[in-house]
Each structure stands twice: as structure tokens, then as C-alpha cells.
Swiss-Prot record:
Compositionally skewed regions (Acidic residues) per UniProt: 40-49
GO process annotations (BP): flagellated sperm motility; sperm storage
Family per record: Belongs to the DRC7 family.
Record lineage: Eukaryota, Metazoa, Ecdysozoa, Arthropoda, Hexapoda
Region spans: Disordered: 27-49
Positions in coiled-coil regions: 269-306, 801-858
Biological role: Key component of the nexin-dynein regulatory complex (N-DRC), essential for N-DRC integrity. Involved in the regulation of flagellar motility. Involved in sperm motility. Required for the sperm to enter in the coiled storage seminal receptacle (SR) tubule.
InterPro entries per record: DRC7/lobo, DRC7_C, MORN_DRC7, Papain-like_cys_pep_sf, Transglutaminase-like
GO cellular component annotations of the record: cytoplasm; cytoskeleton; motile cilium
Predominant subcellular localization, coarse grouping: other
Protein name from the UniProt record: Coiled-coil domain-containing protein lobo
Gene3D superfamilies on file: 3.10.620.30
Keywords in alphabetical order: Cell projection, Cilium, Coiled coil, Cytoplasm, Cytoskeleton, Flagellum
Any Pfam family matching the protein: DRC7_C
Gene expressing this chain: lobo
Length: 897
């Protein structure tokens, strides 16, 4: 900043004459009217349309056809106010809404002068949006309508995407009544938050206010957009967001790869690949030709996009938001790069656009915006002077006055560029203060923006929002607005007209059954429900069809289940169970049963191979129970170097009578040994193995019945949860825990009343000693005597203990004081002044503490005697103690003495 010399201050008088060019303006208006009357209306329309087609890349078009450009966007310099109409209005607007301060009037006068100069310099240019009537019908400068505000909600603190989406959802977009002309109003962002309806200029102003409050260098852009943009027509736009689809992991058994240490070398390839190579060359050549052709078509399409689709192609006014990255005034970290000289320099500013009606963020090359007329923030107003055919060609360095015309010279220091010689220093140059007397932008006249918690949670004006895209319909709902807790629904269609549905995605929140996502496929009539963790049955997802006879898959969180069940596949004649990380290494079970579900036909179990650290008696790979064939088949894991697996097949012998042991018959056992050198199992080992399998078979039958019962319970529970969904809320939710808060407040009030009641009543010394006799209506004389003595003895012991502690403290202080005095007297000449004064002060402190303890000891002794007598008298007068008359008289006489 240049130095400011106050001693050189000289009063500067400057007058702005609004009627200075009135004669010239009047002459120009008369010439335009005379030229318009000489030609008929049809020729005028044809000439204007041809001029537009010739200058389609330029922004110099008249905004209105019949009205002279000098009168478009004119600011009323009589500065009308609406005090009488809105001073006592029901809306309770602040005075800044319907009045104009002297600085505002000067600013409007400056803006009108700036507008007229720009119209004279560029007569064919579109009119500027400088000052529009607000909700109180008072013209306000657009820069002062921006009210930077930071909100307390985490979503609105720093994320540009979340802020843009919130504004698009919170405010209902209304297209301009006449998009060819300038907007006829610009209400404040504070009023817009209450009305929840606004046009593009009002929504852009609100969005910029929130972005600036969050620390982003945002500006409002006024320009020209395509028709579908100003109408917020999304029918030709594909669904822009990624589909949040929760996929369930399929259980895949671990497949052990065979060792690759010894591997046969492959045979040499003796086949000619000339034809394949030639085909690949032709394919690459065709791909290159296709790429070149596509590039030519793309360039032709870009040129065709510059043509006006109708006579109003370059005249539809619209407002959006631009964020200039690497802006000089931005508080965000700057982007740098290393130039050819090796110096680290600041990168040029770049921009991104935000559409306030949709919340979409795009680069400057997006085709929905055609022209940029002007931009503004809370500091200044900038007019685009660049000749451009596409918005992507614009340069966004606002300090360059060749590209951007500044309205107010009183800008922040970061936006100033001083033209000086190379040997001069800006910081050392002395400038007169009169040179800094530039007009700058004043503070906003808008009240501080506020969004209540209920409105923030509601988000949508009618608690729901529905948008139809190309081939998709997106519906969103406010939390707790739907009975089933639905917050979003996305339907994908097979055609662009959204008539043939394909897939429907439903998203839920705050459900007591913890369901969060449902996917329905129309072609297969399949449902898929996804749940969060925390259910009692550890349910993760369910896949089923509308027809209950078809396959159903139930996924579980295996870590929270005792049996480590991960997947259950239910079919009419079979049941498949997948496990994960079980101690017995079982990962697969399959039950085959009759359609009625009451008779087992076959059970197959598969086990993982035990590692070297696991203790496993039988390394079984597959165990099969064939109930109809009355057999048990055991297949063991492959041993080292074996090409096949060992198999043991038992034919179950007839069951013995009750109390008798099973008789083993080796003829009913078939054994296949993969390695003949392996030791042969003895009959005793086979007998024990058979007994284990028969015992486990009985366990399987009982387990099958329990599994079937659990399956029915799961599906019955889901049926009731879908029929009567219940929602839950947090105990910290201030909007929905009113009943709980009322209970807590009532308990707090009762506790406070109890404390006040206890404080107002005299102390009850006898209450703790009557607890053992609480079930008696009246105490006996012996019990009364015991309670009386216990109360007085406790009081006496308390006072004695307190006096003993004080006496001990006094003696310690006395001993320490004497020791310190003897030490000072003995070594008085060996201390310097500082240490000696410190020790003397310590001795004085000890004497002071000793006097304080002595005084407290005296007062405590006196008060203890008084309190003892008070308690004794109160006990004698207490009607709950049943003393004999002679004892009572004797005690009273002792008390009087």
C-alpha cells in the first residue's frame, strides 16, 4: 500500500452533474425515433435479425426492440423511497429496505453516469443490470444486495457442491416473466430465504452471499443463456449424479493355486500371424480415420452451435455464478507453476460456473451459456469488454482493464495495478490522501441471513422435489416427511420419454429396521434390500422375487453371528448356507429336502484345509449324508503329491436296541486310498469315525429344524416391518425429542423445588439415627435413649476431631516458625539481601498463619459448645423421642445448669 501523508491533506470538492449530458442524450433519442419512423416495422425486424446473424459472436445487441437502449435499465435519480408504505408493514422490514442513505444515493448517481457513458461508447451493447427495485420497490445497487454470511451447518461451511445443491433445493426456481428484457426486481437474499421462490438473479445473489461467507471468490454473472437453461428444462439432460448402488459381496470359496515350481515348458508357436498382424494394421488405420472424421464432425457441430436458433437466441437474460480460482482477493491458497526460467510464478486466474437453479458445476466451456455481459461481487461491478464467440475464450484476470471495465475505482489493494518505473517502489512512494478519495462500495443493506434448523432439515419447499431427466426420474423427500422414511427414489427407464421403467432405486433413513436401500428390477421382478449394521438378526441384505417359490438370498454380517453364517440361499427343494471364519473350518452346507420341507434327502458339508498351526483330528474336505441311500461319504483333502483324494464310504448299519452298542461291520465300509503308502486305518479307528458321523447326523437333523424356524422368523419379521414401518430419532434431535425434553425439564424443576424445600426447613439432626426404627410407630425409652446418645456422641466426636486437627496444625506452624528464626539468627551474615528478605517474609507469613489458626481454634471451641447445647435442646424437645418423665426432667435440669 502507498503511504498516506495526512499533513498534505487538502479538501477536495467534486460535484457530479446528472444533467451535464441531458441535451446530448435528448438529441440522440430524437435521432433514433426519426430513423425508426422512416422505415416500416417488417424491414426493421428483418434488418435486426440479419445484423444478429452477422454479429453472432459479439455481445453488442440491443436488449429491447422498440425502446431506445439509453432508457433501458435507467436509474431514477429522484431517489424515491417508500417509507409510508412499508414503515409499519406486516413484514417488518428494516429501514434500510425502504430508504436510501446519502452514500447509496451517491452510488446510484455514479452508477447512472457509468451506464450512460457505456451506452454512448457501445450503443448496440446489451443493457447492464446495475440497480433494480427490491421487495420494497426501492432501487438498490446490485453490489450492495450481496450479504456475505457464514452458516453453522457443516454442509454449508466449505463445500461448493453442497452449498450449490442446497440453494437449488431450498429455493423454488421461477423463470423471468420476460427473459428478453431486464428483470423487474431483485429482492434481498434474506427475503428470498423466507419466500423460498425466486428468479435466477435472486438465486445467484443468495448463492454468492453464501459462497463468499464460506471463503470462496464468487461473483454474480449477468449474461445470455440458452432457452432450456432459463426454463430449467432437464428433459434432454442425462441423470448427472452417480447412482449409489450398494452391492453385496458374493461368497467365493478359496481356491488354492497349485504350485508353479515345476511347470512344463510350452510348445513353440509355429503358426503364422501375418494375417492377424495385417488385420490389426487395417483396424488401427480405420480407427485413425474414424477419429479424424469424428474430429471434423465435432468442429462442424461447434460451428453450428454458434448459429442463432431463433431471433431471441442472443437476448434471453439469465444470471449464474462464477468462482474465480486464483483470484487476487481470494483467501484460498494460490496455485503456482514453474516457468521456463525456473521461477515459481502465480498461475493465471481460471473460472468455473455454477447454475443456481440446478446446483450443477461446470467448466467455462459448457454450452448452456452464450454471452457474459457483466459480473459483480460485494466490492465492485465489472463489465466484460472482450470480443468472444464462446464463453470459454474469456480471460478472468479482473485487474486487466482492457478486458474488464471497473465501475468503482475504490477497490481492495489486491485489485490495483500501479504503473511505475522499474526503479520505483510502490510501498515507498508517498501519495497524497486526496488521491485515495475514490468512491467505494458501501456495506450491504440486507439483514443477516438466517436458516432455521427446521427449514434446513426440510430443505425442499414442499418437503419433496421431483425432476425428470433424460431416461430417469429423480425424486427426493425431506427426512421424516414420508411414513416409511424414504428420502430419495430414482427410476431408470429404457426410453428417453420415461414410459418404460427399468430399475428403481429407493433410499431410506432413520428406520428402526435399519433398512437403507431397496433396488427393484422390473424385467425380472426382483427386489434387493440392503440394511445397516446393528440388527438383532445381523441381517445384511435380502434378494427375493415377488413369487415366493423362486430363489431367495439372505446375506448376514458373519462377524456378529454365533454360527458365522454369511449367506443363505433358499430354494423350494434345497437350502444352501455359506459360513466365514468358523473354528471347525466349515464354509458350506447344503440341505436337500422334500418340497414339503419335512424330510431330509441329502446334506453336503465342505471344509477348508487345516493349516499347519491348526489342530484337526480329521482333515475332511467334503462330508455327504445320503439319507435315502442310508450312506455317509467322507472325502478328505488332497495330501502332498497326491493326484486324487482319499474317500471313505459308510453304509449305516441297523440301529441297535436301546442300551446296546453299535456293531461294526467292515463289509459295510468302502475305502479308497489316494496314496497306497499311507497307513491303513484300523477297524477301531473306522468304528470311532462312524460313531462320530452318526452322532453328528442326529445333530444335523435337529439343526435343520432350527434353521427352518429361523428362516420363517426372518421373513415373517420383514413382512411385518414392511407393513408397519417405524422411524427412530436421536435423543439429541432438538426437533423431535420434545417429550423427552419436557420430562427432563420437569425432573429438573422437581429437584430444584426439593432443594428449596430442604433449605427452608430446619436441620433434622435425629433423622439418620431413626432409620433402624422406621417401621415402628413409637420408640421405646431404651431406643430413644440410644438414638439420643448416638447423636450427641457423633456431634461431640466431630468437634473433638476438628479441634485436634487445628491444634496439631498450630503446633506444626509454631515449630516451623521457631526453626526458621533460629536458622536466621545463626546464619544472618551469610545471606545476600534477596535471600535474607525472602526468608524474613517467609517467617512473617508463618506468624500470620499461626495467628489465624489460633483464632480459628478459639472460635471453633466456643461455637462447638453453643452448637452442642442447641442440638441437645432440640433433641429433648423432639416428640419422636419417648423419654420417661423423670429422665426428661433430669436432663432439662442438667441443660439449665
Amino acid at each position: 500500500m502507498p503511504k498516506v501523508l495526512f499533513q498534505k491533506y487538502k479538501k477536495v470538492v467534486s460535484n457530479i452533474d446528472p444533467s451535464r449530458y441531458s441535451a446530448k442524450f435528448k438529441e440522440i433519442d430524437e435521432q433514433r425515433r426519426s430513423q425508426g419512423s422512416e422505415s416500416d416495422f417488417a424491414d426493421e425486424m428483418e434488418g435486426e435479425f440479419e445484423a444478429e446473424m452477422e454479429e453472432m459472436g459479439s455481445s453488442e445487441f440491443s436488449l429491447s426492440e422498440g425502446e431506445p437502449s439509453l432508457n433501458i435499465g435507467k436509474i431514477d435519480l429522484s431517489f424515491p423511497e417508500t417509507v409510508e408504505e412499508f414503515e409499519n408493514s406486516p413484514q417488518c422490514y428494516p429501514p434500510s429496505y425502504y430508504t436510501l442513505s446519502p452514500k447509496e444515493r451517491l452510488l446510484l448517481l455514479y452508477a447512472e453516469n457509468f451506464r450512460k457513458q457505456l451506452v454512448l461508447s457501445y450503443p448496440k451493447r446489451r443493457a447492464m443490470v446495475l440497480a433494480l427495485p427490491n421487495e420494497c420497490k426501492v432501487q438498490k445497487f446490485v453490489c450492495t444486495t450481496i450479504r456475505p454470511t457464514a452458516f453453522i451447518y457443516t454442509q454449508l461451511i466449505s463445500s461448493v457442491e453442497e452449498i450449490a445443491k442446497f440453494v437449488a433445493d431450498f429455493i423454488q426456481y421461477e423463470p423471468l416473466q420476460d427473459p428478453i428484457n431486464l428483470p423487474n426486481r431483485l429482492i434481498s437474499p434474506e427475503t428470498l430465504l423466507r419466500k423460498r421462490k425466486g428468479n435466477s438473479y435472486e438465486m445467484a445473489t443468495l448463492l454468492v452471499s453464501m459462497l463468499i461467507g464460506a471463503g470462496h471468490p464468487a461473483l454474480v454473472v449477468s449474461g445470455v443463456a440458452r432457452e432450456e437453461t432459463i426454463l430449467n428444462d432437464q428433459l434432454a439432460v442425462p441423470y448427472p449424479y452417480p447412482i449409489v448402488e450398494v452391492e453385496v459381496e458374493e461368497v467365493k470359496p478359496k481356491v488354492e493355486k497349485p504350485g508353479q515350481k515345476y511347470k512344463l515348458r510350452g510348445l513353440p508357436d509355429l503358426k503364422s500371424h501375418l494375417e492377424e498382424d495385417m488385420a490389426e494394421v487395417h483396424r488401427q488405420k480405420e480407427a485413425e480415420e474414424k477419429r479424424i472424421q469424428d474430429e471434423i464432425i465435432r468442429k462442424q457441430m461447434e460451428d453450428l452451435e454458434l448459429l442463432a436458433v431463433d431471433r431471441y437466441h442472443y437476448r434471453r437474460s439469465h444470471a449464474w455464478v462464477v468462482i474465480i480460482n486464483n483470484a487476487p482477493w481470494s483467501v484460498k491458497p494460490k496455485t503456482t507453476y514453474t516457468d521456463v526460467n525456473g521461477d515459481v510464478v502465480e498461475a493465471p486466474p481460471t473460472a468455473i460456473f455454477i447454475e443456481p437453479s440446478t446446483g450443477f458445476i461446470c467448466e467455462t466451456g459448457c454450452k448452456q451459456y452464450i454471452l457474459v455481459d457483466s459480473i459483480w461481487n460485494e466490492y465492485n461491478y465489472y463489465v466484460c469488454k472482450q470480443k468472444h464467440q464462446r464463453v470459454s475464450e474469456l480471460r478472468w484476470d479482473l485487474r486487466d482493464t482492457k478486458d474488464w471495465e471497473h465501475m468503482l475505482p475504490g477497490e481492495p489493494p489486491e485489485m490495483r495495478i500501479y504503473k511505475m518505473a522499474s526503479d520505483e517502489n510502490v510501498a515507498d512512494e508517498e501519495r497524497d490522501i486526496s488521491e485515495e478519495k475514490h468512491l467505494d462500495c458501501i456495506g450491504s443493506w440486507v439483514e443477516r441471513l438466517h436458516i432455521g434448523l427446521a427449514d434446513f432439515e426440510q430443505r425442499f419447499p414442499s418437503s419433496e422435489k421431483k425432476i425428470q431427466y433424460k431416461g430417469a426420474i429423480h425424486e427426493r423427500f425431506s427426512p421424516y416427511s414420508q411414513r416409511d422414511g424414504k428420502v430419495m427414489q430414482l427410476t431408470i427407464f429404457n426410453n428417453d420419454e420415461c414410459t418404460i421403467p427399468k430399475v428403481r432405486y429407493e433410499y431410506y433413513e432413520n428406520r428402526s429396521d435399519l433398512m437403507r436401500h431397496v433396488k427393484y428390477t422390473y424385467a425380472t421382478d426382483q427386489f434387493e434390500e440392503i440394511f445397516n449394521k446393528g440388527r438383532n438378526d445381523s441381517l445384511k441384505s435380502i434378494e427375493y422375487f415377488s413369487d415366493p417359490s423362486q430363489q431367495r438370498k439372505v446375506h448376514f454380517f458373519s462377524a456378529s453371528r454365533i454360527d458365522s453364517l454369511e449367506l443363505m440361499v433358499v430354494e423350494p427343494g434345497s437350502l444352501i448356507l455359506h459360513y466365514k471364519d468358523r473354528s471347525d473350518k466349515c464354509w458350506y452346507k447344503e440341505f436337500e429336502f422334500t418340497p414339503a420341507g419335512n424330510v431330509l434327502k441329502k446334506v453336503t458339508e465342505k471344509f477348508l484345509k487345516a493349516s499347519a498351526n491348526d489342530v484337526c483330528s480329521n482333515d475332511i474336505a467334503t462330508r455327504t449324508f445320503l439319507f435315502q441311500q442310508n450312506k455317509i461319504v467322507l472325502k478328505f483333502h488332497y495330501t502332498f503329491g497326491a493326484l486324487t483324494a482319499t474317500v471313505v464310504e459308510f453304509t449305516k448299519p441297523p440301529r441297535p436296541d436301546y442300551g446296546k452298542e453299535l456293531i461294526y461291520d467292515e463289509k459295510l465300509t468302502k475305502i479308497y486310498k489316494a496314496n497306497p503308502l499311507d497307513p491303513t486305518r484300523t477297524n477301531l479307528e473306522l468304528y470311532r469315525l462312524l460313531c462320530e458321523q452318526l452322532q453328528y447326523e442326529d445333530h444335523l437333523r435337529k439343526n435343520f429344524e432350527k434353521i427352518f424356524e429361523d428362516i420363517n422368523n426372518v421373513f415373517d419379521l420383514r413382512k411385518s416391518e414392511k407393513a408397519e414401518p417405524k422411524l427412530k430419532f436421536s435423543i439429541f434431535d432438538p426437533l423431535r425429542n420434545g417429550a423427552a425434553r419436557a420430562i427432563r425439564m420437569r425432573q429438573f424443576e422437581e429437584e430444584e423445588e426439593l432443594k428449596k424445600e430442604i433449605a427452608s426447613k430446619p436441620a433434622d439432626f435425629l433423622a439418620p439415627y431413626l432409620v433402624p426404627y422406621k417401621h415402628q410407630e413409637e420408640l421405646t425409652p431404651e431406643q430413644s435413649q440410644n438414638a439420643y446418645n448416638a447423636c450427641l456422641n457423633d456431634l461431640k466426636s466431630r468437634f473433638v476431631s476438628l479441634l485436634n486437627n487445628l491444634q496439631r496444625h498450630y503446633e506444626d506452624l509454631t515449630s516451623e516458625s521457631k526453626s526458621l528464626n533460629r536458622f536466621l539468627n545463626k546464619f544472618e551474615n551469610q545471606f545476600n539481601n534477596y535471600d535474607y528478605k525472602r526468608l524474613v517474609q517467609q517467617s512473617k507469613d508463618l506468624e500470620l498463619n499461626k495467628r489465624m489458626v489460633q483464632q480459628r481454634l478459639t472460635l471453633t471451641h466456643e461455637e462447638s459448645q453453643k452448637k452442642y447445647e442447641v442440638v441437645k435442646n432440640s433433641l429433648l424437645k423432639d416428640p419422636r423421642l419417648n423419654f420417661k418423665k423423670d429422665d426428661l426432667a433430669r436432663r432439662a435440669s442438667e441443660t439449665s445448669k
